[in-house]
Amino acid sequence: MYKVFVNENVIILTDEIPFGSKINLFDLKKISLIDIISNVKKHNKIFLYHKNFEKLISCFKKKIKVIGAGGGIVKNNLNETLFIYRRKKWDLPKGKIDKGETIDQTALREVKEETGIVDLRIVDFKMKTYHIFK
């Protein structure tokens, strides 16, 4: 399962149909990106389903322009998490991959640029996320 964020709303790409709750399920082959975004804004959460997860991801990526980015969850020795305030929202430091960079290099550079912290190290990979921007 992958989650794709559209502001506070989420598109869930899955190869399993979730049971037990009312869901908004759409066939990715039959819906445009504009309709997907319109529906997720209306319902706050939608599911895009295909029995073959790799085909689902491939089909979804054909509908959008994928831009690689990296960032990090920064914690101090008190286990407090660092957030930055940008575009009128609290967020984690992150940004686009520069040509020739690895995802780790991007994460370290972006966190340093956005927070000023220089003594950084990557401890663990947490997750891959996708976001849709205008």
Region locations from a protein language model:
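Short, hydrophobic/proline-enriched secondary-structure or compact coil segments at domain edges
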Residues: 1-10
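Short, flexible N-terminal segments of the mature chain
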Residues: 14-37
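Conserved Nudix-box catalytic region and its N-terminal flanking loop in Nudix hydrolases
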Residues: 22-26, 75-112, 117
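Acidic, metal-coordinating catalytic segment for phosphate/diphosphate chemistry
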Residues: 30-71
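Active-site segment of metal-dependent pyrophosphate-handling enzymes
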Residues: 52, 116-134
